[in-house]
Swiss-Prot record:
<keyword id="KW-0378">Hydrolase</keyword>
<dbReference type="GO" id="GO:0000400">
    <property type="term" value="F:four-way junction DNA binding"/>
</dbReference>
<feature type="region of interest" description="Large ATPase domain (RuvB-L)">
    <location>
        <begin position="1"/>
        <end position="168"/>
    </location>
</feature>
<keyword id="KW-0234">DNA repair</keyword>
<dbReference type="GO" id="GO:0005737">
    <property type="term" value="C:cytoplasm"/>
</dbReference>
<dbReference type="GO" id="GO:0016887">
    <property type="term" value="F:ATP hydrolysis activity"/>
</dbReference>
<dbReference type="InterPro" id="IPR004605">
    <property type="entry name" value="DNA_helicase_Holl-junc_RuvB"/>
</dbReference>
<keyword id="KW-0963">Cytoplasm</keyword>
<keyword id="KW-0233">DNA recombination</keyword>
<feature type="binding site">
    <location>
        <position position="54"/>
    </location>
    <ligand>
        <name>ATP</name>
    </ligand>
</feature>
<feature type="binding site">
    <location>
        <position position="53"/>
    </location>
    <ligand>
        <name>Mg(2+)</name>
    </ligand>
</feature>
<feature type="binding site">
    <location>
        <position position="158"/>
    </location>
    <ligand>
        <name>ATP</name>
    </ligand>
</feature>
<dbReference type="GO" id="GO:0006281">
    <property type="term" value="P:DNA repair"/>
</dbReference>
<keyword id="KW-0227">DNA damage</keyword>
<feature type="binding site">
    <location>
        <position position="290"/>
    </location>
    <ligand>
        <name>DNA</name>
    </ligand>
</feature>
<comment type="function">
    <text>The RuvA-RuvB-RuvC complex processes Holliday junction (HJ) DNA during genetic recombination and DNA repair, while the RuvA-RuvB complex plays an important role in the rescue of blocked DNA replication forks via replication fork reversal (RFR). RuvA specifically binds to HJ cruciform DNA, conferring on it an open structure. The RuvB hexamer acts as an ATP-dependent pump, pulling dsDNA into and through the RuvAB complex. RuvB forms 2 homohexamers on either side of HJ DNA bound by 1 or 2 RuvA tetramers; 4 subunits per hexamer contact DNA at a time.</text>
</comment>
<protein>
    <recommendedName>
        <fullName>Holliday junction branch migration complex subunit RuvB</fullName>
        <ecNumber>3.6.4.-</ecNumber>
    </recommendedName>
</protein>
Amino acid sequence: MKTNYEFRPQYLKDFIGKEQLKNNLKVYLTASKRLENSFDHTLLHGLSGTGKTTLALIIANEMNVNCHITQGNLLNKPIDIINLLSLIKENDVVFIDEIHACGLGAFETLYSVLEDFCIDINIGKDFNSKMTRLKIPHFTLIGATTIFGKIPKSLEERFGHIFHLNEYEPSEISAIILKNNQMHFQIDLNEEEIDLIANNAKGIPRLANRLLKRVVDFKINGFNDIKNIFKKIQIYEFGLDEQDINYLNVLYRQDNEIGLKSIAQILRLDQYTIETKIEPYLIQHHFINKNLRGRKITIEGIDFLKNNQLIK
């Protein structure tokens, strides 16, 4: 089975969707290459699975440089930043996924690095210590985050480019599915089936690729009806999954609003997962209302459960 990496486009011309973002990136990349400069520091924010890592790798490929990848929660102290940057060469890309999770010491070290491409470090102890300035090759920092509000203002101001990646249009998701099926599987899928997969992907390319792989698995085993396949893997109308349905049923059983803490206890899920993975899509489809008193299912949410016979 193909990995997520193999589904990723390697160059901007192969990236499907987000036309305005692509057109702007093409301008910025062309200018950087002609001026022989490193690409400006870039912040990508948006939902998981919308192409932030893919775009970081594309920028590195377009600039013909290496991409060094790490996670924000691994960078807590100045020494973590020093160790990371000790590996880079001139104009390389450093990609920090979930950059909001960096520690305070790492953030403070990044501030001077991003502007001056140097780090001031203490060598020695006590009265014998002295400050030494360590020069860093010019590089491009690309940060990705699903929580834009947690990015410190001082860090945000140091990015030359800030791009928001939201959900993709259904036609864009359909094009992604069509291309990946042709390139990797060549399974018989008609236009209606491709659109059905796309309409259940919540506008997220990563989810679309996951659904495509599951459809391929079942079709290879003789299951040809897409709707039946989705029932077997518990994917419901609009792409809602079992967690979404369980959440809606918790609210359906309440006469009044219910708080996030209580929902988390009933579902045995952490509050962060509920707030970031479940609720945004349900709010978008007007299935729930959220206010200071808590959460409440809407008429649309109740109709969805009843029409799909999903009341538990």
